[in-house]
């Protein structure tokens, strides 16, 4: 049986930074947790439905910081919970470098308006 999800979270990573796999995984996790907490505070019903369904997450990529900021503006305009992550700069990249944007959890059809055309990482 195929499970159908109504809610999801999409994490958008900057491919241009060429982060190590471990660093990228940590940044994606920071985004996922931070955006989920935003949803928990501001869109509790979306968070709870997403959590019950199994917490669907999709990781996609962009090639620039500018693209992340444009996507964040679109997410904000649609009222989607989101989180823009800036690295502390302790290891691979300078402090304050924007690494990922997490959008949702929220209804799939709304999230797709922001991230639906992006390629999987």
From Swiss-Prot:
Keyword set includes Hydrolase: yes
UniProt-listed Enzyme Commission number(s): 3.1.1.29
Intrachain S-S bonds: none
Primary location class: cytoplasm
Organism superkingdom: Archaea
GO cellular component: cytosol
Cellular location(s): Cytoplasm
Reaction equations catalysed: an N-acyl-L-alpha-aminoacyl-tRNA + H2O = an N-acyl-L-amino acid + a tRNA + H(+)
HAMAP family in the record: Pept_tRNA_hydro_arch
Protein name, UniProt field: Peptidyl-tRNA hydrolase
Organism: Pyrococcus horikoshii (strain ATCC 700860 / DSM 12428 / JCM 9974 / NBRC 100139 / OT-3)
Gene: pth
